[in-house]
Each structure stands twice: as structure tokens, then as C-alpha cells.
Amino acid sequence: MQYRLDKYGNELSVLGFGCMRFKKKLGRIELADAERQVMCAFNNGVNYFDTAFIYPGSESAIGEIFEKNNIRDKVYIATKLPPQLMRTTEILDKLLGEQLKRLRTDHIDFFLFHMMADIKVWERLKTIGIEKWIEDKRASGTIRQFGFSYHGKSDMFCKIIDAYDWDMCLIQYNYMDEHTQAGRKGLNHAHEKGIPVMIMEPLRGGKLVNNLPQEAKDIFAKHSVSHTPAQWAFRWLYNQPEVTVVLSGMNSDEMVADNIKTACETQIGELTADDEAMLKKVAGAINSKMKVGCTGCEYCMPCPKNINISGTFSAYNRYSADGSFAGFKEYVKCTGKYAPASACIGCGKCETHCPQAIEIRKELEAAAKVLETPAYKAVYKVKSVFKKK
């Protein structure tokens, strides 16, 4: 495993384990699978694990795994808490206490303000005494380092970076988002200030790997160097010295093994100009077929009308990339236990939680127009009858 330094000289594995996407059964994390994958990663040098207060069951799962295997003091835990919940420092203390209890630890290595969307959020936190709170937690050793996660444009990101002496930050960044979100501009700005940058969504929620349009597959196949789409995405990130840790939401043994291999092999500055040009072409091919830039994080769920929002958008993108029949099949599958997109009542609850700022109501309406054909409606009607029995 390769390592890069944080602000204080600690060695962090370039591959971090994102703990949001553990496999679940009936809404509960499959703990045996999660433990096997976490320990495989740990035994191969991964020492950075990312979770959050709002990831159902995640903090408790890794807390149990680390305690059972006696590795808490050999890893770094990064967890997050939404600023919306931070009304007073007393409430914040209570929530932090719950996180420590779940994680079965007396300290958190990296504490992030989750989805800090605007400088106004930080200004509000200052009015409740957040800077003094940070100083107190740092002095007591309860929290070692502070940062924030961000989804949004680069200009606002730079304002937040400049507003405080942060220890680190977490941004969405990949070869499709090089000039969107915080982007390369934000990455470079943080790096110039000596602030380590952790990366989320390296595969854009799987969009850089799964159901690629044929044009993108052909570009990869014709390139002089052969790697899988996932390996190319990680190599593009590891190639950049400004990147400290790349998170991957791993939930299969194969994914863990492949990501470890790539993290061990890739060197800074390894990609050639031809490699970079090839990935730009791939990004263009994917973008030309993508109807909705959903990463499948499911922060928008649950929907009051039981619509599978991310599943609908995946089917909509599949329709655009691979044709109506492929989109139809995926849509039938994703609405098996859910209501169709046309059931949307336009409440807008989902849009307040979407980190990608997607106009979900508008896109659901557009998806319904092309996916809910007479054939689909007939199939859904039959399935609904059987569901009632």
C-alpha cells in the first residue's frame, strides 16, 4: 500500500474505505461480509475509514468490527455530522456522544461538517460558538482533526476553505468532474494552502464503470494501455500529488482486491498525455449519453410516495445509453417494490437533500414520459395485482 501525509505528518493509505455502501439485507448491513472486506483492506494496508452519522448502521458496524478485531488504534476514523442538526453546542455534544458510542471509541480522528454547502452555513455555526467548541474538543483529544465535505461549485468551496484553518476536506472529484463541483480549481486551492484533500465518488457512483455507452467502451479498447474502467478512474486520481486519500465504497471481495492492487501499483505522474486525452474522450462519450447526473447516494430517500429515485434515474440513463429496451428492463426491475416515477406529487423533499442539486421533480417527470410506455404500464399493473395477494 502507498501512503500520503496528512497535515501533521501521519501516513494515510491512498485508498480509503468508504463505509456508506456496505451490502444490506432487509435494510440491515450484512455484518459478516462487511467485516471480511474491512479486514481484508486493513490487512493489505488500508488505514483510513470514512463513515457518517446519517449512514444507517455504518458507524455501529465499523465500531463493532474494529473492537472485535482489536484494531481501533491502528486505523483512522473519519465521520461526519450535518450542520443542520447543530442548533446549539449542547445538541452537538449529545450527537457527538452518540457517534462515539456507536463507534465504540473515545476519540474521532477526522470530524467533518457533512455537506457544507455554503459559507453562510459556517457563519451560522460561528454564532453558536463552533470555533470554541472545536478548540475544546481538540484540546481534550476527543477529536483530532476537523474538516468538511462539500458538493457544489469551486468558487463557494474556495470561500469555505479560506474561512477557517481546516485540517482537511472531502470533495467529489473524478475525471468527469474535473471542471465541475469543487473541481481541479478547488483541489489546487486547498493544496496550495497545505490542506489535505480526500476524494469521494471516484467512480461517480459507478457511472464510470457500469453500463458504459458503447462509444466509451470502444475508446478504452483501442487505447494502447489496457486497464479496466475502474482502474483507469483510480489511476487518474492517484496520478495527482494534490490528492491525499481516495475513498471507495467497497462492498464485494473482488472490488476490495482490485482496488488494493491499483492503489499499490499506481505512481504519481504515471499517466501520459495520451492517457489523459483518452480519458477526456471517455468522459465526453459518457456525458453525451447521461440524462441525469445521479450518483446513487440515496440521500433523497425515502420518498413519501415510495418512488425509487436513483433506480429511476439509472434506468433513464440506461435508456439514453443503450436504447429503449435496456431502459425498459431496468425500469421494470427497479420499480418492483416501488411506485413509478409518475406517482411523484412534487413535494420537493428529495431536492433539499440532493448533493448534486438535481431538479429531481423535473427529471422524474421526464423519465416517466419515456419509460412508462403502454407495455410498462401493463407489466406494472399485473405486478401490482400480485403484490396485493
At which residue positions do the language-model features occur?
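N-terminal binding-site loop/beta-alpha segment at the start of enzyme catalytic domains
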Residues: 1-75
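Structured C-terminal cap/extension of enzyme domains
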Residues: 5, 40, 46-47, 66, ...
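Hydrophobic faces of well-ordered beta-strands that scaffold small-molecule active sites
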Residues: 13-17, 49-51, 75-79, 108-113, ...
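Glycine/proline-rich, positively charged
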Residues: 25-26, 39, 86-203, 211-217, ...
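Short beta->alpha linker loops
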Residues: 53, 57, 117, 151-152, ...
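Short, well-ordered alpha-helical microsegments
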Residues: 58-62, 153-158, 256
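Alpha-helix-loop-beta-strand connector modules within alpha/beta enzyme cores
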Residues: 60-79, 131-140, 192
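Acidic, glycine-rich active-site loops and adjacent beta-strand->loop/helix elements
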Residues: 81-83, 371
